[in-house]
Amino acid sequence: MSFVTGVGLTSYGKHEGLSSLDLMSKAAELAIADAGLKRAEIDGILCGYSTVSPHIMLATVFAEHFGIRPSYAHAVQVGGATGLAMTMLAHQLVDAGVAKHVLVVGGENRLTGQSRDASIQALAQVGHPVYELPLGPTIPAYYGLVASRYMHEHGVTEQDLAEFAVLMRTHALDHPGAQFHEPITVADVMA
């Protein structure tokens, strides 16, 4: 059986002088403390990608930066699904007996570690290099296509989807580490 034993989160915003590895380290330290563990007890690490630190072996780079020597290290890159995918993979690693304590970590510092243009350029590379990138779609365009298809297949309206955004913001209001702290309405979303 596996379960989440600790959580750590850095605040959203500008972090002058801190790299994405530094932010990951701060969050990891908080998560380990919350779990009541010591660094030496971490025997697995899953590390999400960072557009500001685009290293092909980011999990091992982070492990070295953070000062741990896990027996299992894996970098995960599946866009917006990375957090959930890492959580699922951590569960599978524990259930399979590969690791007992898996640290799941990710972090970005785009507001201070990357220019606006560099962020847009990095995020514009998520499509197929031959069939999509030359046409110039961005991540919102991809999600728009998915939403349009979902609406078509399930009879959902734009207002229905707006209600979901309102619900997510309502939940975020109770979280001190949330990116946004003001409530929104369906009218706000639809504007």
Question: Which residues make up each language-model segment?
Answer:
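Conserved "HGTGT" condensation-loop signature of ketosynthase/thiolase-family condensing enzymes
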Residues: 1-73, 92-96, 103-191
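A short, structured active-site edge motif that brings together acidic residues
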Residues: 72-81
